[in-house]
Amino acid sequence: MATKLYPIGMQTFSEIREEDFLYVDKTEFIYRMTHTSGKYFFLNRPRRFGKSLLVSTMQSYFEGKKELFKGLAIEKLEKDWTEYPVLHFSLAGGKHMEKDQLVRYLLYILKVNEEKFGIVNDSPDPNVRMLNLIKTVYEQTGQKVVVLIDEYDAPLLDVVHEDTSLGVLREVMRNFYSPLKDSDRMLRFVFLTGITKFSQLSIFSELNNITNVSMDTEYAGICGITKEELVTEMHEDIQQMADVLGLSYDKTLEKLKENYDGYHFAWPSSDIFNPYSLLTCFSKRKVDSYWFGSGTPTYLLNMMRKYDFTPIDLGEQMDASKDDFDAATETMTTIMPLLYQSGYITIKNYDPETELYTLALPNKEVRIGLFRSMLPHYLAAKSAMCNTTVAKMSSLINKGNMDGALQLLKTFWETVPYCDNTDYEGHYQQTMYIIFALLTNFRILVEQHTFRGRTDITMETKDTIYVIELKFNKSAQEALDQINNKHYADAFALRDKTVEKIGMNFMIDEDKAIVLDWLKFGE
């Protein structure tokens, strides 16, 4: 039973503070941002990373609700606590809509804000309504207006891969945001959040002075939970988790890091934990996959197919310039910007000499979630059975019984229906990579470079390195011969582990069944 109240899924700052839920203090970031020379700010972070709570915290701050900030950093920093009128728009409800539906939704959220200030306006044009709302509130209160826009890109995410629909909905949103430029003298602060980055020209029209703080080191920890925050503010939670798991404090922290840590949105940056997964883990007292299971990234899988981005590509580290991944998604020529901005890959290193960033999957939760979501694309209806097979294989490999694990795999493949579009070696290599990548207890490398070529799959356990070569409609002996003739195993000769060489071959028999055969060196 959880002894602390965790704000899982909660987005309202006042509710969290008034009902004594855990709050990780981000108010120093808010003070810093609201006391610079800028007026327009943009931040993108992955879903469920605390963006909406950040916006709600800003709203309470600008509304002068000092009592909610007792004991927080901003209590000592802010002296005036001036109350400003706040317009808060959430576009979260604008998903899966056609043009007319989206316009009606925009009119609805405008009406909610109008009613807050006793304003009546029946114009059918969101542009006119927004401009009038800001002007009237400014004149009515005598104070400059604060505009907070949460999930600004929500109406566009589902159609980011559809050029026609994207253009239509993008124009609707441009029309909605355009009054911000004309209202400049009446605005105190404007803050927009979202998952992805759309170009200023396409969305914000003439609003060319917006400051994007998404990759600024000073704001790297504005969302999410840093390691420092975890070990200082949730020390007891880690210890309680350790007691449940039967592990030491340090081993439990290591397990939490392995599953939920690893994000960096700037470099240098503290390690950032996924807040939704971490808090859900503490609440349930169970290490599991929470973030990925909270929303199926259909649009992401669609884009991966569009850009021919494979599981092997996803599993490898990528070197890229900032412009390659911190780019507008609607003009991207690779999947990298969407993967990065959605939180499926993250910054792992930076080389100041080349100005190249190294990006990779952040942690175990994301890796397993992504690969599991890909299984239906490669195995159709058999993906659920594959998860069971993988779990059993992992147990056998841990016991050193690779033959038993491969026999399970052979039996599984015999249940997979043959399709003409899978009649090539690459399909089986990609599928096998997913299967092996789901063996989470082991280190898996695909097409690892050696001085004589590249191995198809290398798997490393605590005491054994398996060098695996795959063939299609050839023979396991031919695969094994390639390992030997090209001396793939020599790359591991100095490692203090047993090296086993395995040749595998897939064949389609006369009954259109998929048959897996394998041969180990020395047998």
Kindly give the residue locations of the regions a language model identified.
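Domain-level recognition of nuclease-like catalytic cores that cleave nucleotide substrates
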Residues: 491, 497-523
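Structural motif
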Residues: 146, 464-466, 500
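Phosphate-binding site recognition
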Residues: 1-424, 439-440
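Active-site metal-binding core of divalent-cation-utilizing nuclease and nuclease-like domains
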Residues: 136-141, 435-462
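Metal-dependent nuclease catalytic cores in nucleic-acid-processing enzymes
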Residues: 176-183, 337-345, 431-437, 482-502
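Mg2+/Mn2+-dependent nuclease catalytic core
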Residues: 167-171, 472-489
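Conserved catalytic cores of phosphodiester-cleaving nucleases, focusing on short active-site segments
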Residues: 432, 455-472, 486
